[in-house]
Structure formats: structure tokens, C-alpha cells
Amino acid sequence: MSTGTSASYKRDNAFYALDKVERILLDGYSLCDACTGRLFGLRGYGLSNTERGRALKTLLIMKAFQASPRQADLELLRVLARTGFEPARELLKKLSGEDVEVKACSICEGLTGRYYELALRAVEEAKSYEFNTFEVGVRIDAEVIRREEELWRRYGLESAESIRNEASREVGKIISKLTGKEYSRNNSELLIIVDLSAGAIELHPAPVFVYGRYRKYARGLPQNPWPQPDERIKFNTSIEELIVKPALELFEAEKAKFHAAGREDIDVRTLGTGRPFVLEIKKPRKRNIDLKVLAEKINSGAGGLIEVLDLAYTDRKTIKKLKSLASIAKKAYVARVKFEKPVDDEKLAEISKVFSNAVINQRTPTRVLHRRVDKLRKKIVYRLEARKISQDEVEFYLETQGGFYVKEFIHGDNGRTTPSIAEFLGNNVLSIELDVVSIEETAA
């Protein structure tokens, strides 16, 4: 038999684990039942590491005792007794009268005996949270990991399981049994961090994601809290605040993040189907709120400034979808524009044809140039219709690609957007009242 085949045979032999444990204990290590079994934790199923460790120690007692008391291997019994293994302690005392002192486990120093205690504490602390699924994360002193891995290397142990992995599983099993909740590593609603060394528990509830659409009825209302004075702002609040505050109260959450499919200017209304958004509610204690109640609370508290609709639970993927579509999905607008002089009727009659599926060149608008890089964007106007209201006023209906600067398309931004409505009509723009009336959630 070759050397490689012989080594493989020894590793696969039923007595391989037994021989390794005997050698380790006789070399002066003391291992608790769990740490003993964990040395071969990746071998087989159906046994806990504690059960596996006790089984190995039981077999070693049988080996130590042999055929009769006179032939007993007292040294092997002593090292087994020092691990705290009661059958070995009792047998040693009976055979030799010795009562050896129990040594702390050379790897965990007693930490594996804390699983049930920490699980109970986690269950108690989790009572104030709503959840159906959970997972357990483990923190442990680096010295424990070092001792464990050093033992693996020294004795060539290739099927050992880490104490961190064992603790996560065993504490999770206890919590699941005590609460009836499901242990899940995927999409868990509550992450329970167990610090084995410090004996501490941390709870981290997963965010709740709520999809919806908002209509903005008031001009002068920013989407998010505005950091500096702005003459366009007419209200001491924002769309985000009007939506977030009621949600925090109902979900008993610490904070929330507001994700919208783009944004309208402060002086622009959003009507029609509304603007899609996702509310990411962080560290919620409640997860199963009736969203009709949330919508009513938001709408009644908004005083007519905004309205939310179509609220539904969703997940993080929807945020990515909203962000990715914001620059390409089709949007529709109605703009009421006042010009410097009377509008040419013939030109106005041609405008729909000229700007049907037209590609517009837009440099970064002057009004945002201080905070955005100056670059050229090519965007599409799919449809443009015009209705004359008075000699110098026109109402336009536009359907455009997402990320399109509508105001600049109307007034031209001193040539930074071309072609523009003002350029085509040969007429300067004095004022614009703009409304968003439709935002699609699929690319045009």
C-alpha cells in the first residue's frame, strides 16, 4: 500500500477520530464534550457535537478499562476525568481512589456551556420585536479562534467545525424551539448577534420596505429637507418628512430612508398617477402594519400638500429598479408657459411634428452647474402637443425620456439645450408652471 493510500486509509478508518482524541488528551489538552465532537464536526449527521464528543470519550473509557480493572489505563482515565467527563471521574475514583481536578477546556474555556443561557436572554430581548424568521450571528474572542485553529493545524484535523458556526446553529436551534420562529439564513427578519465571550446580545431587525406613489399638490414643497434658504420654498416641511414621520410612529422604528423615482423641482407639482417611491424603514419593532392605516395617517397629516396611494410591501430590489429606470422611463408633463410676445400660430401648428421623437442635446443646466458635472446628455421628446390659451400663453403636453430637463427644453437655457421650444418659436420665455402627470415604471 502506498504512503498516500495509507494516510487516506487512516483518515477514513473508524478509529481515526478516536486515536486523534486520545493523542490530544494525552498531550495535555483538556476538551469539553462540544469541543471534542467539533474536531470531527463535518463527519456525519444527526449528532450534535456534544453528543459526538461524549461518544468518543465513552469509547476511550472502554479502551482504557480493557478486560479487567488490573489492566486499566489509568493515565487515559485521568486525562478523560480532567475534562469533566463524569463517567471517567467515577471510574477512576472507583479503581484508584483518585479525585482529579477538572481543567477548563483548552479551546473554549467553558463558552460552549453558555448556549442555553444566551438563547434565553435573546428570546427575552426579542419579545418587543415582531418577526417570523431570524438568524444568529456570533462574536467570539480572537484568542479562542486562534487556540482552535492551532489545534487543527498541529494534529492535521481536516473535518473540524468552527466554534462560531456551532454556536450560531445551536443557539439558533434553542431560540427556534422556544419561540416557534424559523431559523433562516436568507431574508431573515431579525439578526440576533450573540457575543459568546462578553455574554452580550444585540438585535438587528431587517428593514421593512414599503412601495407607494405620491401626488404633490402644492408648489413650493421640496421632496427632501432643504439644507439652505430658498425663496421658492413656501412650507416648513418636505414630502419625505410628511411620509416618514407617520411611518416611524406606526412601525416603532428608529429612522427611515426615502427613495424616489427621480425628483421634481420645488415649484413643480406631481399629479396624475403620482411618483413611485420606496420607504426603507430601519430597525422597526413592528413589521405587519396595515398599510391602509399608514396611508390614512400620512394623508390626514399632510394637510392637502401631498397624497400617497397604492402602498404595498416590497423588497430592496424595487429600490434598484426605481433608480435604474429614473433616467430612461417615460414621463409626461403639462407646462403652462408665458412668452415675451404673442406666439406665432403657424409655428405653433408645426411644433408637434417637429418635436415628435426628437433628440434633444442638453448640457448640464446652469441652475445646477454648481453641484453637477458639466456634460452633454442626449434625451428624447416622444410627443409634444400645444394648446394656445392667450396671445402670449401656451399649454404644452410633453412625453419625454427620464432624466430630461423640461424647463430648459422650454426656455433653452441660453443655448445649453438645443433645439428648444423658445428657439423654435423665436420667442423668449417669461414664466413656466410645470406639472408631472405620469411616470412609467418600465422603460419606454
UniProtKB/Swiss-Prot annotation:
Q: Where do the catalytic residues lie?
A: D265 (nucleophile)
Task: Return the EC number.
Answer: 5.4.99.25
Keyword Isomerase carried by entry: yes
| UniProt keyword list | Isomerase, RNA-binding, tRNA processing
Residues holding substrate: Y333, Y405
Please give the SUPFAM superfamilies that the UniProt record associates with this protein. Answer: Pseudouridine synthase
Which EC main class describes this enzyme?
isomerase
Q: Give the Pfam families listed for this entry.
A: Pus10_C, Pus10_THUMP_arc
Family to which this protein belongs: Belongs to the pseudouridine synthase Pus10 family.
**The name this protein goes by in its record:** tRNA pseudouridine synthase Pus10
Instruction: Please give the organism.
Output: Thermofilum pendens (strain DSM 2475 / Hrk 5)
Gene name tied to this protein:
pus10
